[in-house]
Structure formats: structure tokens, C-alpha cells
UniProtKB/Swiss-Prot annotation:
Listed name of the protein: Dihydroxy-acid dehydratase
Origin superkingdom: Bacteria
Family: Belongs to the IlvD/Edd family.
Pfam family, one: ILV_EDD_C
N6-carboxylysine: modified positions: K125
Length: 560
């Protein structure tokens, strides 16, 4: 097998005797230098329940790689806990961590001349960070998702971490007492695994399964169930076979694969963050992809799955109902999926789905029949207008009326908005504007889960709108529009909004407009001055200087 291995540059020849000496110290024997050397990029951490189980999965992958004839080399990648950093300055590092993860995996794999990589991730940015690196590296690779958390339970209701965020708003509005608040807090996260609804982590793992970079059924498994470890071992076996056959990510991460991922994300009601991350992965894979592609697919694909945050069920329920393969098969038979797209197994999507039923089982309610979808078209709408000439992303599930025109309540940070919500200062009909939270302005494009959850908890979810140049958590729902571009920091129109200005959000018409005359906007633009950078040293300063627009994926390597 050694003939086509790039690790030969490290393991072969007299001049590489010192290199082999060091490899012997980490477990290589005389016969091992002809084997493929495979990295296991492991995001294990006790920082977050999302990554708590990854160490055991890495050990299982290591054993399976050895059994398959490869030499595994484990290395760590960082993680940020979005849930724990939410609503704080620390959340500015979340999207930054996507780039750090990508850079670190690329650095190790190329620095060590590895022949392949098995990446294991849990929390939100682990997934796109790993896939960006895989696309850049273009060496045989497979992604293993650490698995989803099981739901908590209180008063006969399933709980997720978003339940705790919403409880803060309910408590502040006097709708629940402190005892209930504390009980929800205690029960929301009962063990290891990523946040349980169709939030960002589960959305991206589902996307990777649809793209063929993860094994079927693996994206909805519970972190603590034995099948997750078994799937990890099988992923390692498949990776060794991919190395032997030289199945490269560039053959898998094609335009068809991205279109398949977008279709599945629409069908499952996935996170707005998928738009940002798929744009970034496509950039690394050199695949043309734009916001308009999401809108084109959205118009054709219904929402089939009744999943939290706006629905009833969690990812483990989806798994029991047939998982992502069931959703994919429903799309495939209706011509909404590319069946000839390649997967990491060497099979096509159609071949992988051959034995999956064409329709969902009748004994479950998670996946709707095709003729009774939750929504007739996709939920992630791309809005444009004078407030977002480059585009913005709206999630239009879970709202009774997807249009609003109201007076602007303007905040230059998430914290000041949160104070107003908890103080009862937001009124029905208001359109909240949170700005200077974009990729450059934040920097880091924080997720606005705390204010959106507080709005829901206060009973205002159907009565107010919220727009921001920041992001939203996968746990967000309501009349919310994020990723507004150009962002305020670079002089986007959102920077020119004044308190009391009328703003229209019209999701069905895909419009977002500031109802101010062109002359007045030009007067304000002439008077506007860019703010000083919030950071002049460290990683946030570097990120702010290099990151591009959210409409392009907020990538940091778009130098040409």
C-alpha cells in the first residue's frame, strides 16, 4: 500500500532514519512504516457536554484503524462551548474557533504528511472547522459526529438547553417561579452529547451525512448509545478503504453534494448557521456557491420534520423515525437529490439509499408524509433590500405572521438589547436592531440566542421582529433576520438606522427594507464614521482584519 502514500516522505530512505526513530517512540515497529499514517483529529474536552464523549470515540477509532492496517496518530483540536459562552464576550470567539480548528487540522495533517484524517467533533464549530480543513487538505477523510444529547424531562415535557434559555425570559416576565427555573436548569442537559434539537451541531452533522462525508444514520445517533462507538469503528474501516482506493474529498465535495446538503437542511428545518458554514466549506472546496442557491432550493423543498426549536421532537426521535436516510430517500425519489453523487464509501447516494423505504413509517410523527409537510417550502429564506444589499438570512418557522412593519429599537450590542427585554421595555410591534455584532464589528458574529429566547419567554415571539448583523443559534426561532450584510462596521445600511425608523420584514416576499428616503439615507451615510476596532491585539484583532462578509461565509483566507 505504501506506493501511493504521501507519508513516504517521512518514513522511507536513509535520510529519514531520525524521523523513523521518533515514530518508533510513539509505537511504530519495523513493519509499520509501509502502512498509511492516519490522523485522528479529536475534539475531546470537558469544557462542554457536546465533546465529553469524544475521547472514547477517538480510542475506538484508533483501535479500528490499527485493525484495518493503518497507523493512527491522535491529536487534539480546540472547542468553544457556544451554550456556555452565549450572551457573554466569550461568544465572540465561537466563530473564530471554526477557523482555528480548520487551521490546526490542516497544519497537523500537512506538517506530518498524514495519508488521511478521521475528524471527530461535537460542538457547533467543530463540524465546519473540520470540513473546511478536509476540503483544503484533499486527502482521504471521514467525519465522525460525537452524537446528540438525550432530552431532559420535566413536568412531562422534553427539555433541551434552549428550554433553559427560554425559562429566563419566562421568569423575567413572571410566568414561572424560581423553583421551576432551577428545575429546568437542573434537568435540561442530562449527559454527554451535542444540543438535542435540530440546532447547529445536529444540522451540520446531518449535512455531512447528506454530502457523503459521514456514514449513513451516524448524524442522529445519541452520544451515549453503543451504536455511536460502533459507527466510529466502521468509519475508520471505511477511511482505510478510501485511502487504498484514493477516494478524495474533491470527488465527494462537489456542487451536487452541496445541493444535496441544502435540500436536506431545508427538509429537516435546520439552523441558519448552515448557510454561513456551507458557504465557507464550498470556498475551501473551490465549489461555486452563493446565497441565491439556498433560495432556489428552498423554493422547491418542503419542511418535512417536526423538530425543535419550533417543533415538537429532538434528534434522537428523528433517529428512531428513520434518520437522515429516510429524509434523503423521500427527496431522491422526487428528483430533489442527486443520486449519482459519490460518498466516502465509494458508493453513490442512490446506492447507499437503495434499501431505505420511499415513505416514512406511519407509527411516527417526526417525519411528515410528503403530502402533509410541516411547511410547503423551505424555512431558510434569503432576504434582500436596502437594509441588506448583499443579503440576509431569515428563519421563518414557528411564527404565525411572517411579515412585520414597525418602529426600530436600536442597540449597538447584544447586552444593551438584553437589558431592555428583561426590563420590559420592548413592546409588541417593535423591530429590534442589534448591530456592530458582525464578523468584523463584533468581532466574531455572536449568536443572539439570549435575546431571542428572552423574547419567546416573554410571550413576544409573534409580536416583534429582530434583525442583526450577528448570527442566531440553531435554537432560535421567531421573526428573526440575521447575517445582515454589509454589516454595520463597514458602513452597511444597518449602521444608519435611527430609533423610531420604520422597518419592514416580509419573509414571503423575501424583503427587508428601511422605510427612509434615499436622500435621508445619503445624508446619514455622509455623517457616519467607522468606529474604532474593539480589539487591537490577539486573535480577535487578527480575525477582524482578515474576515470577509457573512454573505461569502465569513472566511479568513479569501486573499485572491
Amino acid at each position: 500500500m505504501s506506493g501511493n502514500l504521501r507519508s513516504r516522505i517521512v518514513t522511507q530512505g536513509v535520510q529519514r532514519s531520525p524521523n523513523r526513530a521518533m515514530l518508533r517512540a510513539v509505537g511504530f515497529g519495523d513493519g509499520d512504516f509501509e502502512r498509511p499514517i492516519v490522523g485522528v483529529a479529536n475534539g475531546f474536552s470537558t469544557i462542554t457536554p457536546c465533546n465529553l464523549g469524544l475521547g472514547a470515540l477517538a480510542e475506538r477509532a484508533e483501535a479500528a484503524l490499527r485493525a484495518g492496517g493503518a497507523m493512527p496518530q491522535l491529536f487534539g483540536t480546540i472547542t468553544i462551548s457556544d451554550g456556555i459562552s452565549m450572551g457573554t464576550e466569550g461568544m465572540k470567539y465561537s466563530l473564530v474557533s471554526r477557523e482555528v480548528i480548520a487551521d490546526s487540522i490542516e497544519t497537523v495533517c500537512n506538517g506530518q504528511s498524514l495519508d488521511g484524517v478521521l475528524a471527530i467533533g461535537g460542538c457547533d464549530k467543530n463540524m465546519p472547522g473540520a470540513m473546511i480543513a478536509i476540503a483544503r487538505l484533499n486527502i482521504p477523510a471521514v467525519f465522525v459526529y460525537g452524537g446528540t444529547i438525550k432530552p431532559g424531562r420535566y413536568q412531562d415535557q422534553d427539555l433541551t438547553v434552549v428550554s433553559a434559555f427560554e425559562a429566563v425570559g419566562q421568569y423575567s416576565a413572571g410566568k414561572i417561579d424560581q423553583t421551576t427555573l432551577v428545575e429546568i436548569e437542573r434537568r435540561a442537559c442530562p449527559g454527554a452529547g451535542s444540543c438535542g434539537g435540530m440546532y447547529t451541531a445536529n444540522t451540520m452533522s446531518s449535512a455531512f451525512e447528506a454530502m457523503g462525508m459521514s456514514l449513513v444514520y451516524s448524524s442522529t445517533m445519541a452520544a451515549e448509545d453503543p451504536e455511536k462507538a460502533d459507527s466510529t469503528a466502521l468509519s475508520a474501516k471505511v477511511l482505510v478503504e478510501a485511502i487504498q482506493a484514493q477516494i478524495l474529498p474533491s470527488a465527494i465535495l462537489t456542487r451536487k453534494a452541496f445541493e444535496n446538503a441544502i435540500a436536506v437542511i431545508m427538509a429537516i428545518g435546520g439552523s441558519t448557521n448552515a448557510v454561513l458554514h456551507l458557504l465557507a466549506i464550498a470556498h475551501s472546496a473551490r465549489v461555486p456557491l452563493a446565497l441565491d442557491d439556498f433560495e432556489c432550493i428552498r423554493a422547491r423543498v418542503p419542511v418535512l420534520c417536526d423538530l425543535k426549536p419550533s417543533g415538537r421532537f429532538v434528534a434522537t426521535d428523528l433517529h428512531r423515525a428513520g434518520g437522515i436516510p429516510q429524509v434523503m430517500k423521500m427527496l431522491l425519489v422526487r428528483g430533489l437529490l442527486h443520486g449519482d453523487a459519490l460518498t466516502v464509501t465509494g458508493q453513490t447516494v442512490a446506492e447507499v439509499l437503495r434499501d431505505v423505504p420511499t415513505e416514512p413509517r406511519t407509527d411516527q410523527e417526526v417525519i411528515r408524509p410528503w403530502d402533509r409537510p410541516l411547511y410547503s417550502s423551505g424555512h431558510l429564506a434569503i432576504l434582500r433590500g436596502n437594509l441588506a444589499s448583499e443579503g440576509a438570512v431569515a428563519k421563518i418557522t414557528g411564527v404565525k405572521k411572517p411579515q412585520i412593519t414597525g418602529p426600530a429599537r436600536v442597540f449597538d450590542s447584544e447586552e444593551s438589547c438584553m437589558e431592555a427585554i428583561l426590563a420590559g421595555a420592548i413592546q409588541p410591534g417593535d423591530v429590534i436592531v442589534i448591530r456592530y455584532e458582525g464578523p468584523k464589528g463584533g468581532p466574531g458574529m455572536r449568536e443572539m440566542l439570549s435575546p431571542t429566547s428572552a423574547i419567546i419567554g416573554a410571550g413576544l415571539g409573534d409580536a416583534v421582529g429582530l434583525i442583526t448583523d450577528g448570527r442566531f443559534s440553531g435554537g432560535t426561532y421567531g421573526m428573526v433576520v440575521g447575517h445582515v450584510a454589509p454589516e454595520a462596521f463597514v458602513g452597511g445600511t444597518i449602521a444608519l438606522v435611527e430609533a423610531g425608523d420604520l422597518i419592514t420584514i416580509d419573509a414571503p416576499a423575501r424583503k427587508i427594507e428601511l422605510l427612509v428616503t434615499t436622500d435621508e439615507l445619503e445624508r446619514r451615510r455622509a455623517a457616519w464614521r467607522p468606529p474604532a476596532p474593539r480589539y487591537i491585539r490577539g486573535v480577535l484583532a487578527k480575525y477582524a482584519r482578515q474576515v470577509n462578509s457573512s454573505s461569502l461565509g465569513a472566511v479568513t483566507d479569501a486573499f485572491i
